[in-house]
């Protein structure tokens, strides 16, 4: 299978080249020139596969590695998860399920891809005879940074730099990154928000002077953000996996449609679900759940994407985003794979901060949007715990709220999988506050209190943080990112 760019239809490269490059030279994102299609018989057979074997099957249909290679990568990656089934599906009531994506080493859904990406990237570099070290440049709104750091820690032939908004992540997220171990890692806070960090990363990828300067240090750039196809493609797997779990439980029959409600910021997670539907998975609706930074919710309601609005720091910081990079891939797909259409919209976004697409393109895609404010989110955490004895994190609570609103508006009783993207222990003060109605500003105290009232085991990745030494506390201006990157690993 070959890949092209969302902005230049003449681009033709392999999957391994797309993974090494990260982003196309024209600024576009790599997309497959075609997608594998699975029949209902295929999908029924998938239910009997382990997570590793299902991932091997699906990734083999996208990437230019052998099945044995991919199987080895998957076994190594997913052996780091604390549950054998990697992404458990919990039944909540007659029509609601929780897909738990937070059982990896950093307790966030990003682990599903970022435990695997180092294997894919190093193999891709070798396959394409890359002599330089690969410098992975990452912008994070909280979870990607730690997952990428942990994934690439001391991986031979790689170095990694993570940029996070200094005042835009939770205390646990920040501490996870600032205490990161490894000789090939660097972490910088920036004075700005996630969009500023992401803009800096994208600009560096297109800056010939920066690329040349890094080449003098024997580095070639790549990315671990979901702009990299190697980050996005593993996420398709858990949509098929969760459908198989509902089949195995006997709660649906093959061919029955289900919904997914997905907390959305950069649009990567829900885009993987959209691609799964495109590949044959029986999906009725994808519910795109936003917090008060509701740029995506508004887009799916009106067809207008407008980042010209106030930016809010919320208790669901991984969704505090106004420029959703993966939406570019969605535009490419719904426009009939038209790079001119994408270029027009991306130019409008860069110059005016907004663009509009025909609403019928959104209707055909089967995605609906909604949002939850802070009070809604806290109420969802409280009510869900009261009803089901299940502590939601602050992002999954947004997805639950938007799903409940969708059901109230439509009466749709289709079985729905809510995608749970993080452990509640990554946001302990807000989760504890929502459940107990008591304020606790100290994160470690909140963790202990949350454990006492919920009975949910404190993950080792959290409990060991209290004794870890802070290694990275540098904060740079958003206009000084280039110097930070150039000097991070200078000998």
List the predicted regions and their residue ranges.
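PLP-dependent amino-acid enzyme catalytic core
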Residues: 1-491
């Amino acid at each position: 299978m070959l890949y092209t760019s969302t902005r230049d239809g003449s681009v033709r490269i392999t999957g391994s080249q797309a993974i090494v490059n990260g982003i196309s030279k024209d600024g576009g994102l790599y997309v497959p020139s075609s997608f594998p299609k699975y029949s209902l018989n295929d999908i029924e057979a998938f239910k009997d596969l382990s997570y590793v074997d299902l991932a091997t099957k699906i990734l083999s249909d996208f990437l230019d590695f052998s099945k044995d290679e991919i199987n080895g990568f998957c076994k190594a990656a997913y052996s780091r998860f604390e549950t054998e089934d990697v992404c458990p599906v919990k039944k909540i009531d007659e029509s609601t399920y929780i897909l738990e994506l937070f059982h990896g080493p950093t307790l966030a859904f990003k682990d599903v891809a970022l435990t695997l990406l180092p294997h894919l990237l190093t193999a891709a570099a070798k396959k394409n005879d890359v002599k330089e070290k690969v410098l992975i440049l990452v912008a994070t709104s909280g979870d990607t940074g730690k997952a990428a750091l942990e994934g690439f820690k001391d991986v031979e032939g790689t170095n990694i730099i993570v940029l996070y908004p200094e005042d835009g992540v939770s205390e646990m997220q920040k501490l996870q990154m600032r205490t990161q171990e490894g000789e090939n890692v660097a972490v910088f806070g920036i004075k700005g928000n996630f969009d500023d960090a992401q803009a800096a990363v994208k600009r560096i990828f297109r800056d010939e002077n920066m690329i040349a300067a890094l080449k003098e240090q024997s580095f070639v750039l790549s990315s671990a953000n979901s702009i990299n196809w190697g980050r996005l493609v593993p996420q398709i797997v858990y949509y098929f996996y969760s459908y198989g779990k509902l089949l195995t439980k006997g709660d649906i029959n093959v061919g029955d449609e289900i919904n997914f409600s997905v907390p959305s910021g950069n649009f990567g997670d829900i885009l993987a679900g959209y691609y799964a539907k495109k590949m044959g998975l029986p999906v009725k609706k994808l519910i795109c759940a936003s917090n008060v930074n509701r740029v995506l919710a508004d887009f799916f309601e009106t067809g207008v994407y407008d980042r010209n609005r106030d930016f809010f720091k919320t208790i669901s910081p991984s969704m505090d985003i106004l420029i959703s990079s993966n939406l570019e891939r969605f535009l490419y797909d719904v426009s009939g794979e038209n790079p001119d259409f994408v270029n027009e919209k991306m130019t409008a976004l860069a110059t005016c901060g907004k663009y509009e697409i025909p609403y019928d393109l959104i209707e055909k895609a089967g995605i609906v949007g909604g949002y939850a404010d802070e009070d809604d989110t806290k109420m969802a955490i409280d009510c869900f715990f009261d009803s089901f004895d299940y502590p939601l994190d602050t992002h999954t609570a947004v997805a639950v709220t938007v799903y409940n609103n969708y059901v109230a508006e439509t009466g749709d009783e289709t079985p729905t999988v809510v995608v749970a993207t993080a452990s509640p222990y990554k946001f302990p003060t807000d989760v504890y506050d929502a459940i107990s109605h008591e304020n606790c500003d100290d994160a470690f105290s909140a963790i202990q209190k949350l454990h006492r009232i919920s009975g949910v085991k404190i993950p080792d990745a959290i409990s060991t943080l209290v004794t870890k030494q802070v290694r990275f506390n540098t904060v740079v201006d958003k206009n000084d990112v280039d110097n930070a990157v150039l000097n991070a690993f200078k000998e």
